[in-house]
Amino acid sequence: HASMPIGAYSEKQIMPQEKLVIVPDGISNEIASCIVLKGITAEYLLHRSYSAKKGDKVLFHAAAGGVGQILCQWANAIGCTVIGTVGSKEKEAIAKKNGCHHVINYTDTNFVEEVEKIVGKNGIDVVYDGVGAKTFEGSIECLKVRGMMVAFGNASGYVHTLDIKKHINAKGLFFTRPSIAH
């Protein structure tokens, strides 16, 4: 998968060796290109946007998606308590199988109330939100004092405004909107 510098849609590209990954036999280029982007995304979310550590309480929206499946397994392996949200009954088993200790279907359940039942009133250390508009306000409610909101996607729509007094001052929260290009 070649994305930087210019040439992502080229049939061939000259790349620096340190930017390349050897693909094992038996894995097609199509599969490898999908895995690499999702894996890179999971890595920068879990280690560069917020450095998750053993004992952290993590909330990941869209836990059954490509990035979610990788990140939830990884966070579980680190020793985090992993809470994942999904948008359908079918995806609950996928999220559970891929490292979520707790799975919440946010289409038929108030995920804010469920998170509080799981972790108590102190809240979540970090929320990884790739959903966007539908989950943004609730995600903020779930965070602990000085918690971190990592907003990396907008599958349900963009969050157009951020009320600093309401969203940040109330709990002293941290926000980031990371990009793998940086």
How should each PLM-predicted stretch be described?
Residues 1, 59, 104, 125-128, ...:
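N-terminal Rossmann-like NAD(P) cofactor-binding module of classical short-chain dehydrogenase/reductase
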Residues 64, 68, 72:
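N-terminal Rossmann NAD(P)H-binding glycine-rich loop of SDR-like oxidoreductase domains
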Residues 62-63, 131, 154:
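NAD(P)H cofactor-binding loop motif with strongest signal on the N-terminal glycine-rich segment
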Residues 41, 66-67, 134:
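Hydrophobic/small residue at the entry helix of a nucleotide-binding pocket
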Residues 78, 86, 134-182:
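Glycine-rich phosphate-binding loop and adjacent beta-alpha segment
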Residues 76-138:
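Adenosine-nucleotide cofactor-binding segment
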Residues 1-62, 74:
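NAD(P)H dinucleotide-binding glycine-rich loop of Rossmann-like/cofactor-binding domains
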